[in-house]
């Protein structure tokens, strides 16, 4: 055995390739072994080096991995008919083994038999024992491990009897010892590159083969000091490995001759070396200003700014002649950076390969199985059924996608949930597409549907029967047909990567089912157990990655780095929390147990002590990272990461201790003090020019800023870039609406506009809201709570029926109210039993009704105010109050109560489920039209009677803070004060109204006859103005805004506060407020009244 070592600042691979070429000249077969995590990149690098930069093939040199070696020497056909289980199958077998134990046999682990996490830990433990050349008997003796021994022993017994699983690598090692391959190995050279430690399994293989080959070479990183310094070294793992090999067999140890070294990276290595030795020295290693060319540390504002600066530098170096393949981006948290990096690199037109395994969990087929499992487990929850259908895998042959939308709308609106409701006919006949929805429901969810045939009963079946039944679902439910269609469509559109994904997922399903049959074929299972086992194999599966072999930027986890990786290295997202990465031992064996195993086992048996191994690995990873660049290295940390303040890693602090200030660079978003650093490509400059423009406007000019540069860039873009010109033209119109065409107006309105009173209040809140909700009839899903329409209708119906009762008096009021409540409850029960929120609301309704009814009871008992009509309508067929129109606008509505004073004055009572009061300002701005319209309708219907006004009555169950009262007797008065009518009253009737109990009268809401008439005219003017705009087809996005309120905490102006349609109009208060909102509340009450009395009103 030869062990060649060199310092990590040197090129180890260059020295090993010289040996490989020597051996090839001797006509020897060379096996060049590299770590599995970098085998593809290393093979590509080695072949390019041998061919001096161009692609080539060298038939007698194979870059490979330890576990692949048996394939090259053992060409025997496997003569077994047994199934070989993969990771999914092993998990299934462990599950079956666990299910075979009784609770008293494995009390600690019995409850974890279906835990995916525990099954994964068992697979991991078994794999560790194999690579450590250990068996279950080597586990320390304690109650936990006694259970693990039982589980693993039974598992191995069943595996060896029923399946073809065995360690090919271990078997190959045993056959090497027996001399089976001696003849083949005579002209073989084995070279090992990049290892700093080996597993027990690998060491046993090395011991078995190293004397049988022509030449056996191990190349690694170390220095003379480390070979004698023991543990106090940056090469501690390597020195331990070399010492172990030298003690076991003859070793020729030599150092590879020095080549040219980058002094900056040598300094960084020396800093780490001194730190790892814990020595106090007078040696001062400084990073100077000129070292910035080779090494920088960035402190970026945030992740996006950090990635953008990487992208800008890549684009600039490309212009200078570099290739994309010359760049490697290493990330501290691959999952956290994936989305942002892809977006930024796409913007900067940088091709890249992101070496992050992608889960299959988002594929439609996996979503289908997840939904299928959830449907059975949770008894057909609404969302689970909708997700199943929206996966578009399980469909009817001629299913229109629009029908799925109708179906979703129906089941969400009517809260359809539970198997019974989905298998029975939908009955809400007022739903316009009920026939289409029912047809789809019957075919896909009905009692004879493929889904119900598969899931319909809860009987246990054998595994093979479940697989057979699933095949029927896949065929009859068009799952197979749809998967084939997805694959063909992707191929047809040249989306070969997507087509490959479809194929991989389908193959994974077939493989999982085959392994399921191998393990559970004769086991009896319920459907939910079958789906759970199946899903465990699918949702954790990953797509195979095809490494990039073209001119692209490579992006990967920084832990996969190796020395001399590339010319330019950007290691980003390196914070205190992940650099170095601290890993906790989450296996079934503690560090103490691992130490005990290693102290009691034979020479070629040892298991990794994770606390020690992780420390050594972290140390070597940092060492590899700072030596990974050939020309330029950047280490970067964002100040904000995952919404938390980032802190410098100890490694950063170590390098910065004696570094020039130029080494640490603050990376900001675009600003006026930098120029060319921010130029990447034209698309990215266009994307950030808005920020630059804002900076130009908001900041004061200084002698140091680059505003002249940015103004020039702006002018160049305006003149030469058509895309930028279009953006500029569209900026001011990004939410501008287009007037409706005359023929469209004719179709939607005709000669007359028919609308409700409340809809015009919506018009004055925002014209676009009116257009969407009233013209286009868009509806939002309504959950039944205290503010929903259903609850409002419930209250109205209760009080309408009570107030219509004959012979109603204060004495029998409560009795009649109880009877009415019972009757109305029956009518509304289907709404209030839809879900938990609805049931909770229902439980509170009676309290609210009875509390509000105290006011009505007082009204019934007085002779001063009598109810003439309840729920009297206008503008509807057979309306009690007739029709009401303003020019060509025909209004409809319903007045909750028409009440008459003893003096024959008429007025309106309006019930509300939320707090309301009459405000002159809102009537002036068009936001409060109901009261004045109701009074206008009454005046028209009863021309010979005078009007007293209109009042609101809120339905509520007033809460009382008991800490604020002195005696319980005060509660009745407090409730009485809180339950009052409020509104506007005419001056002539004010005195009489004041004398009626439970009416709160404000001086500001008492109006004389002249003011009342002016208010009626103003109200009609609002309708006319709105009608004219509608008939001209004008629709503006103009939510109301009160200047004194501005933008609230949720980022809305007043008109958008409760609007559910913002995703359609895209109104953003901070951008559009000044141009697109309608300002209200600009006049005082005195000014409004003065204007009503004769002055011209501003429109």
Curated annotation (Swiss-Prot):
Domain of life, per lineage: Bacteria
Entry keyword Nuclease: yes
Q: Where along the sequence do coiled-coil regions lie?
A: none
Q: What is its EC number?
A: 3.1.-.-
Q: Which GO terms describe its biological process?
A: double-strand break repair via homologous recombination
Q: Does Iron-sulfur show up as a keyword for this record?
A: yes
- What InterPro entries has UniProt attached to this entry? ADDB_N (IPR049035), DNA_helicase_suRexB (IPR014141), P-loop_NTPase (IPR027417), PDDEXK-like_dom_sf (IPR011604), PDDEXK_AddAB-type (IPR038726)
Alphabetically sorted, this entry's keywords are: 4Fe-4S, ATP-binding, DNA damage, DNA repair, DNA-binding, Exonuclease, Helicase, Hydrolase, Iron, Iron-sulfur, Metal-binding, Nuclease, Nucleotide-binding
Q: Name one Pfam family in it.
A: PDDEXK_1
Q: How is the cofactor bound?
A: Binds 1 [4Fe-4S] cluster.
Main EC class the enzyme belongs to: hydrolase
Q: What is the effect of changing residue 910 to A?
A: Slight increase in UV sensitivity, slight loss of nuclease activity, still recognizes chi sequence. Shows hyperrecombination
Binding-site positions, [4Fe-4S] cluster: 766, 1056, 1059, 1065
Protein family according to the UniProt entry: Belongs to the helicase family. AddB/RexB type 2 subfamily.
Other observations noted: Despite having helicase-like domains, this subunit does not have helicase activity.
Q: Which NCBIfam families match?
A: rexB_recomb
Q: How does it assemble?
A: Heterodimer of RexA (AddA) and RexB.
Described function = The heterodimer acts both as an ATP-dependent DNA helicase and an ATP-dependent, dual-direction single-stranded exonuclease. Recognizes the L.lactis chi site (5'-GCGCGTG-3'), which stimulates homologous recombination. This subunit has 5'->3' exonuclease activity. The heterodimer acts as both an ATP-dependent DNA helicase and an ATP-dependent, dual-direction single-stranded exonuclease. Recognizes the chi site generating a DNA molecule suitable for the initiation of homologous recombination. This subunit has 5' -> 3' nuclease activity but not helicase activity.
Q: What is this protein called?
A: Exonuclease/helicase subunit RexB
Name its species: Lactococcus lactis subsp. cremoris (strain MG1363)
